[in-house]
């Protein structure tokens, strides 16, 4: 078979997989109505099918998107609801295993001697993708989601140090916080994190400057993980630091946000996906709202999957005056600027007429650099005001230690010994730290400073 015959065969196989995927989707109540009257023969006429938007999923929650009875699903999840009512998402064991196999195949660091500290929220499907990938590798999985009070940040640092953790998986900001916390504890991160070989980052944009910062601080490879609760896994980073879309799992389109037509090669558009392996909650032309750019050239790693840059949410694009910037643009420039100041800690405010960067430095009174600030604004393409603050003003490290201790629910408290003497169910369940007067004074002063800063900014914006 020559090259052209192979291409025809592969195309025919892809068309067949797509037809089967759409047929599975039609088993759900939503797609039975949504696709009524539409015929799909292959990829060439995929664009004729109607798009699926997030509001469709919300309106169909909880059972309308299911293509199988609920009891045949392996896991149930919900979105956080930060942008509206939570959306139900269901996944099956077979598709979870397909996604885990992709991660296991593309990441050589996931071997039988791996110990992975999973800091993704445990209600997120990606946590179970990692669990299954580690099962395939015969490796160890530590489920310690960052939103769980029983494994706060300081305990996560302790896990890495005591257990010889070789991999962590988290939102991109977490490695920055864990590294900073280790320094605050008087530890040497180069020794504390010496066992870590790979850091998986997902759930938010990962601009190049942030990747470089994590790789420098942890002396480990950073692997980007791209996906969502609705779509689950969509992309995995390669050894060259490029994100490859999972073309074995999904049929992808990149659409213009205004016209919903395909963008030109190399142009930014909204990622739109059709499930190829999902059996429980298949999606057809799901408009994710993620702004991406597909690289026109192949990656030198040899992996055939399309290479993508994830730029952030289309709804989060910042427009001030005639300027326009994505979250990836803003974060890349901010991390580059902060790195030159010897810090990783900053917070960006989006104000009506300007961006406002609050950056934490050792000597705030003597580091102002108008030339660097002007370059920062030029790199982003928007006006930027920089405010330099002292240690603990942007990140209060002590707050990372102040979470409650969690106990098993109980309605009995034995007061005869030295154990905790509780008198309510909530006291038995949660033990909040007791503050001395110095801590109380510290917290009060911080609240006053933040209130004054907030009031000043609000007044300035009202004058505009």
Where are these predicted regions, by residue range?
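Nucleotide 5′-phosphate-binding alpha/beta core
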Residues: 1-105, 162, 354-358, 364-464
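Active-site phosphate/ATP/adenylate-binding loop shared across adenylate-forming ligases
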Residues: 55-195, 205-213, 217, 241, ...
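Conserved beta-strand segments of alpha/beta enzyme cores
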Residues: 140, 221, 251, 383-385
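Conserved beta-strand termini and adjacent loop/short-helix elements that scaffold enzyme active sites
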Residues: 144, 225-227, 255, 387-391
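A polyampholytic, Gly/Pro-enriched intrinsically disordered region
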Residues: 161-171, 217-221, 242-251, 404-415
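AMP-binding/adenylate-forming catalytic core of the ANL superfamily
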Residues: 168, 272-382, 407
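Conserved AMP-binding/adenylate-forming
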Residues: 197, 206, 210-298
């Amino acid at each position: 078979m020559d090259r052209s015959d192979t291409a025809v065969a592969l195309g025919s196989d892809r068309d067949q997989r797509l037809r089967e995927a759409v047929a599975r989707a039609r088993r759900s109540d939503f797609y039975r109505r949504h696709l009524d009257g539409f015929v799909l023969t292959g990829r060439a006429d995929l664009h004729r099918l109607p798009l699926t938007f997030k509001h469709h999923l919300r309106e169909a929650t909880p059972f309308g998107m299911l293509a199988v009875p609920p009891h045949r699903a392996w896991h149930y999840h919900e979105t956080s609801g930060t942008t509206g009512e939570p959306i139900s998402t269901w996944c099956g064991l077979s598709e979870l295993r397909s996604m885990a196999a992709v991660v296991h195949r593309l990441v050589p660091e996931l071997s039988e001697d791996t110990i992975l500290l999973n800091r993704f929220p445990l209600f997120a499907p990606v946590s179970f993708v990692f669990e299954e990938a580690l099962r395939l590798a015969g490796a160890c999985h530590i489920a310690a989601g960052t939103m769980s009070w029983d494994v706060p940040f300081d305990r996560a640092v302790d896990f890495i140090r005591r257990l010889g953790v070789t991999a962590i998986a988290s939102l991109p900001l977490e490695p920055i916080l864990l590294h900073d916390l280790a320094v605050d504890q008087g530890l040497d991160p180069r020794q504390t994190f010496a066992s870590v070989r790979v850091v998986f980052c997902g759930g938010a944009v990962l601009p190049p400057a942030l990747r470089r910062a994590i790789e420098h601080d942890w002396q480990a490879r950073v692997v980007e993980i791209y996906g969502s609760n609705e779509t689950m896994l969509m992309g995995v980073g390669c050894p060259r630091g490029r994100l490859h879309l999972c073309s074995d799992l999904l049929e992808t389109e990149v659409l213009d946000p205004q016209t919903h037509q395909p963008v030109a090669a190399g142009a930014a558009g909204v990622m739109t996906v059709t499930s190829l392996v999902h059996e429980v909650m298949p999606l057809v032309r799901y408009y994710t709202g993620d702004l991406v750019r597909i690289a026109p050239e192949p990656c030198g790693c040899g992996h055939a999957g399309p290479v993508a840059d994830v730029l952030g949410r289309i709804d989060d694009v910042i427009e001030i005056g005639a300027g326009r910037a994505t979250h990836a643009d803003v974060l890349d420039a901010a991390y580059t600027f902060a790195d030159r100041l010897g810090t990783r800690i900053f917070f960006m405010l989006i104000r009506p007429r300007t961006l406002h960067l609050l950056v934490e430095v050792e000597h705030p009174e003597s580091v102002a650099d108008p030339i660097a600030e002007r370059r920062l604004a030029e790199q982003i393409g928007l006006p930027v005001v920089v405010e330099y603050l002292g240690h603990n003003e942007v990140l209060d490290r002590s707050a990372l230690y102040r979470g409650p201790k969690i106990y098993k629910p109980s309605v009995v408290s034995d007061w005869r010994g030295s154990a905790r003497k509780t008198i309510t169910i909530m006291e038995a369940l949660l033990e909040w730290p007791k503050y001395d007067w110095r801590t109380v004074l510290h917290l009060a002063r911080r609240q006053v400073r933040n209130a004054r800063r907030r009031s000043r900014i609000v007044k300035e914006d009202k004058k505009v």
